A protein has these predicted regions:
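Accessory beta-strand-rich segments of carbohydrate-active enzymes
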Residues: 9-122, 126-128, 152-153, 168
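Short, solvent-exposed loop/linker segments at the N-terminal edge
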Residues: 133-141
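Short strand-edge motifs at loop-to-beta-strand transitions and within beta-strands
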Residues: 19-21, 63-67, 178, 186-194
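Beta-strand-rich binding/interaction modules
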Residues: 50, 140-181, 190-192
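Conserved, mostly hydrophobic/aromatic
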Residues: 52, 109, 147, 210, ...
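Short glycine/proline/serine/threonine-rich loop/turn segments at secondary-structure transition edges
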Residues: 30-33, 73-78, 156, 196-211
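N-terminal carbohydrate-binding accessory modules
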Residues: 129, 213-265
Length: 265
């Protein structure tokens, strides 16, 4: 960011600037790979160029975004990445407040290499995996795992999708395994439902976390294409006017906090 002094001055800089970065890649690195750029945070308006071509525009400094650069990178010459950033907006008062509009790239930027078949990286720059708990009790938890798989190859792909719930020791306590077919340059949305018997419930006093592991392998299950892990706390809650907030059936007094993210998520 160009606002390193924003905590100590009221009239910090609200303007636009350019970032430039040169990088190299070669044909061997790109073979059977997809290449992505992920920006964790750029404030407030970002235009991303690669080798002089505008790839994407992103509005908002508090959300990450990802762009596929596979077809734009050069393997025979240096690549020039340029990002034009503007944190000025004359229509939004005040200039200063109880939070800081840090200008520029103020979080990490990642260059990600993925197999041709992988878990989607462009779904709002998330992990591509969403875990929900349709029903939870002390006896049983139903776990929904959703996501999108993509195939950027010119041929249809037949793959193995393995969804596991792991305990804190890494032991598999619930699992779903099946074959999926993805058309050439296509996508496949999935949802797997798993049952967890006698779950260890999460609470502030006992913050037990499971881990949901989603693996994508070749049709024989030998070659790992992609893998993502998502932490999972199994719990249920309710709110009503008479009894207030309850966690896992027990009353819990909530003490809130107000903290602006400013620099880090």
């Amino acid at each position: 960011t160009w606002n390193a002094d924003a905590y100590s001055t009221r009239n910090y800089r609200r303007a636009s600037s350019w970032y430039k970065k040169e990088f190299r890649t070669d044909a061997a690195q790109m073979r059977d790979k997809q290449l992505y750029l992920k920006f964790d945070g750029v404030n407030s308006l970002a235009d991303v160029y690669l080798n002089g071509e505008l790839l994407t525009t992103h509005k908002g400094g508090y959300s990450a975004f990802t762009v596929d650069i596979t077809d734009k990178v050069r393997t025979d010459a240096p690549n020039l990445l340029m990002v034009h950033v503007n944190n000025q907006n004359d229509r939004i008062p005040p200039l200063s407040g109880d939070f800081t509009i840090f200008g520029g790239i103020y979080r990490n930027v990642w260059l990600i290499s993925a197999a041709k078949q992988h878990i989607s990286l462009t779904d709002y720059a998330s992990t591509g995996i969403y875990v929900d708990l349709p029903s939870v009790s002390e006896d049983r938890a139903e776990i929904s795992v959703r996501g999108t798989l993509v195939n950027r190859d010119v041929r249809r792909a037949v793959l193995k999708l393995d969804v596991e719930v792991l305990d804190t020791d890494g032991k598999t306590v619930a699992q779903s395994l099946r074959s999926v077919r993805i058309d050439a340059d296509g996508a496949f949305a999935f949802e797997e439902r798993l049952q967890l018997e006698k779950p260890q419930l999460w609470s502030p006093d006992s913050p037990y976390l499971y881990s949901v592991k989603v693996s994508l392998k070749d049709v024989r299950g030998k070659v790992l294409k992609d893998e993502t892990r998502v932490p999972l706390g199994v719990r249920w809650f309710s709110v009503d006017a008479q009894e207030g907030f309850k966690l896992n059936g027990e009353p819990l007094k909530l003490m809130g906090a107000c903290r602006h993210q400013d620099q880090m998520p």
